[in-house]
Amino acid sequence: MSSQPRFIHLRTHTDFSMIDSIVKVKPLVKACAANEMVAMGLTDFTNFCGVVSFYSEMLSSGMKPIIGADVKVKSPLCGDEYFDLTLLAKNNEGYRNITLLLSKAYQRGYNDLPYIDQDWLIEHRDGVIILSGGTQGDVGKKLLKENVAEIESAVAFYQEFFADHFYLALSRTGRPNEERYIQAALKLAERCDLPLVATNDVMFLNTEDFEAHEIRVAIHDGYTLDDPKRPKCYTSQQYFRSEEDMCKLFADIPSALENTLLIAQRCSVTLRLGQYFLPQFPTGDLSTEDFLVQKSKEGLEERLVFLFPDEKVRLEKRPKYDERLQVELDVINQMGFPGYFLIVMEFIQWSKDNDIPVGPGRGSGAGSLVAYALKITDLDPLEFDLLFERFLNPERVSMPDFDVDFCMDGRDRVIEHVAETYGRGAVSQIITFGTMAAKAVIRDVGRVLGHPYGFVDRISKLIPPDPGMTLAKAFETEPQLQTAYDSDEEVRALINMARKLEGVTRNAGKHAGGVVISPTLITDFAPLYCDNEGLHPVTHFDKNDVEYAGLVKFDFLGLRTLTIIKWALDIINVRMVREGKPRVDIAAIPLDDPESFELLKRSETTAVFQLESRGMKDLIKRLQPDCFEDIIALVALFRPGPLQSGMVDNFIDRKHGREEVSYPDAEYQHASLKPILEPTYGIILYQEQVMQIAQVLAGYTLGGADLLRRAMGKKKPEEMAKQRLVFKEGAEKNGIDGELSMKIFDLVEKFAGYGFNKSHSAAYALVSYQTLWLKTHFPAEFMAAVMTSEMDNTDKIVGLYDECLRMGLKVTPPDINIGKHHFSVNEQGEIVYGIGAIKGVGEGPIEALVAARNEGGIFKDLFDLCARVDLKKINRRTFESLIMSGAFDKLGPHRAALSKNLEDALRASDQHAKDEAMGQTDMFGVLTETHEDVENAYANTPPYTEKQILDGERETLGLYLSSHPVSRYLKELSHYTSTRLKDLAPNRRGQISTVAGLVVASRIAMTKKGNRLGIATLDDRSGRLDLTLFGESLEQFGEKLQKDTVIVASGQVSFDDFSGGLKMTVRELMTLDEARSRYVKSLAISLSEHQITPSFIKQFKALLEPVSGGTLPINVYYQSPKGRALLRLGVQWSIIPTDEILTELVNLLGESAVELEFE
């Protein structure tokens, strides 16, 4: 290493620039260290997103971090044209000023790129050093235009306001006009006494990364690499050059090199990291600590009265609660976190006071009795052995972290309340970054390289869709990917390039729940990033960096299930009030309701929170949970680790007495562990049990036991060796055999890897139980709420509708006279379809209809509705959707009459409005159509056929409500099939099932091997089944998989691991016509003597003649007063039994007179 540094990189970008760099912070810092540089500047484009990690990494590597940003600027001199500047923080004042400039750039809104006004630099100039932006700066652009007056004017600004803090930036990277600019800049520097500084505008680390960088930029800009129109703004020379390279490059301008060192010496920013700063919570005359104690004791008293209404029992229980409360309060106050608990208490209490449901807890916070006393959580931690130290460990100082679930509808109101309470400038949400994930980066790189879609799609589909999937993992799990990589040079080139870009930051977004509350302005800690309209501010620092920078994060999460519970209770309590019954309080329901557990044991858990998947239902069937502890266990057991380890089987066998319960193992157990492991039948299932075992067996404090639990999770050999020794010595002190303690230690270590946080499991089990209880006791109201939550997802609505039918609930079509935007329940206990779930009907039209109904009462008919509603808010197509969905059924005799008269009703309403405007309405100001007028308008319109009605419902609702296309065939289909879909079960080997139903979905897919695969979904109104057709079956029957046709399918039924349901591999498939040809013996027609007239015979003959010549004979059953006779029509009248002819015969003779006869 040379004794004296000769150059410092002052201008580098990382991938946080999100437009023009592929460098991560850590590799950048490593490159700086490898080149033996003593300092480096980070100047990402208009953001400080990488500052905290950059600052920390540089200091820990023994180098000086220089913090800055590249910005776009506008000034009157340059008109609408942007120019570039680099802002460097000379000191903490400069850092704060750049923070404010970046925040203002986002907060005022922007079209393409955020920018600052040059005038802002005057107000925020203290402590800021400016590099001129080279050829793209205002001075550089004027130099290249050679306009002397404008050059002088541009320079004058910086000479006045940044006298010795402005440098002319030079770079030699092979970009256009650089050398011409440098020669002009040298003359200007001499003439105006301006210092020069050398930069290399670093965008990547090595020259070989240039192509990857260009692809990154093309992905952002939407070009392909070979597009002649693609802007080429960068060169292969913008890499991290060594000091030696830079010194050679600027050997002719030594002052430009020296000034990099001078600037580095001038810049010194100190960030306060690792400290926490909370806003002051108002506590009156009391200290924060004393106020927390007071509130906690008051809250605990309320809780104890609720938990133990009997005063004698309460006195017995009180000591252990008081003791636990005092322990927790001491720890919270000693660690300096009383304000945190009070802040969370306040916004949760505000939410409850304002009818915004809050979850009972989430994560380890449910283990705190103080949180329970303050009503932050709603689960008694002592009852369920939940540990405070799992949440806040006095032996490992870290911030407490309450994740709070709110009703989806109210979450934003809570954040708004917090902003009003602490000041809008002190509250912000947190940024999160989207990265180029494995599957997407293959697609993006393939597109930019110009590969055909099919080629890229094939490679992308070889990457499993699992969350967190990487290219490296994909190669491990998908052999075909490795084969394609090895055998195809184009595939190899694509993947190699994708590897360079995988994980690179793609975009910025808003963290799902993170909110920070600052004691002062947020911008005292971090800049603010906003959307294009300058709204929805988020910090430039992500959730980890923002906490490291001193701001405390609060997680405001939206949980849809809480919204469902609220909606259900709203419907329920309207009914309870109407019936004079007490309102339902979901927080007060018993946790041992027998009916709820019976429903649970039957696995009827569709729509029950966390318990509705096929895999979970199978686990429930095996476990047969009969107490709340079992539901807690279910949540913890249904994870890959326990399921794959055999732990689940042991748990179930022990519960049902098929395996001996031991604590924890038949060979190695100890009586002291029984109280800890009894709720889980001796299985170590929870992290809290690991901690309690260490405490009871080996004398650990619970704080120390939490550290042991963490160590076991990390599996570091050196740390585990130390812990084994501590565990053994502690056990021996407790009189427990050392060898036995080590055997138990090994078991604990094994299961610690699978252990789940019981606090989280218990809190979420409570939400699961609440939905289970609602489904059990208020099924219609609960299902109406669940369906409301899925109004935008037709597939989900279809599944939930099927569940309603299974439950014996009736779902009626939407009804404009009683319906609401949401699904609701009428006084007969029927679910009324939500008007908001009708396709093509937005909130505006619904609001207009409901407003008219609220103002004038229910609508008498279509003309009345059109007269009273604001037609400017509802177009014709919306009216048609409402009619075809059934929402207007009570406004006329049938849907066809309503459709036919819609135009007249709209015209009459329009004319009425014009007359009203001219003062020509009748004295009551309403339409003058009489009842007779309306009846006449509706007359002589034949109703729609059942098919037309059902097609309309499917089009507007996504499902069939009034009937089902398959309903008319159910009796017939029973002759072709072995079972209904709802009763279907997997076949034994060699066994075949035959089913029938309506094809509701059908497509052809490709397998990973490139083979065609037919996939269809069959619906017989009792359930649904996925069909798959391979090879010969697909070739032979594939064309029959037409959507909305009825088919009969035979094949092997098995479990589908992907969907969790059943699937059939089809062996044979018939259309309905083919099934009739095979199974139907004859067509029976019943006639009476009154029907047989010359005109009837003529009509009957006209119907049969076009379809005669088939194979199905016709038997006519003639009924007269003297008796019933069978007349077999001649073979020439045998027909093809199509739907069309059967429908026409039914229309002519009546449904009971036409019947298919089977053997």
Swiss-Prot record:
Q: Which keywords does this chain's UniProt record carry? A: Cytoplasm, DNA replication, DNA-directed DNA polymerase, Nucleotidyltransferase, Transferase
Gene3D superfamilies of this UniProt entry? 1.10.150.870, Bacterial DNA polymerase III alpha subunit, thumb domain, Metal-dependent hydrolases, Nucleic acid-binding proteins
Instruction: Cite a single Pfam family from the UniProt record.
Output: PHP
Query: InterPro entries in the record, alphabetically?
Result: DNA_pol3_alpha_NTPase_dom, DNA_pol3_alpha_thumb_dom, DNA_pol3_finger, DNA_pol_IIIA_C, DnaE2/DnaE/PolC, DNAPol_HHH, NA-bd_OB-fold, NA-bd_OB_tRNA
A GO BP term here is:
DNA replication
Which reaction is the catalytic activity of this chain? DNA(n) + a 2'-deoxyribonucleoside 5'-triphosphate = DNA(n+1) + diphosphate
- Predominant subcellular localization, coarse grouping: cytoplasm
Q: Domain of life here?
A: Bacteria
GO annotation, cellular component aspect: cytoplasm
* S-S bridge residues: none
Q: How does it assemble?
A: DNA polymerase III contains a core (composed of alpha, epsilon and theta chains) that associates with a tau subunit. This core dimerizes to form the PolIII' complex. PolIII' associates with the gamma complex (composed of gamma, delta, delta', psi and chi chains) and with the beta chain to form the complete DNA polymerase III complex.
State what this protein does. DNA polymerase III is a complex, multichain enzyme responsible for most of the replicative synthesis in bacteria. This DNA polymerase also exhibits 3' to 5' exonuclease activity. The alpha chain is the DNA polymerase.
Q: What is this protein called?
A: DNA polymerase III subunit alpha
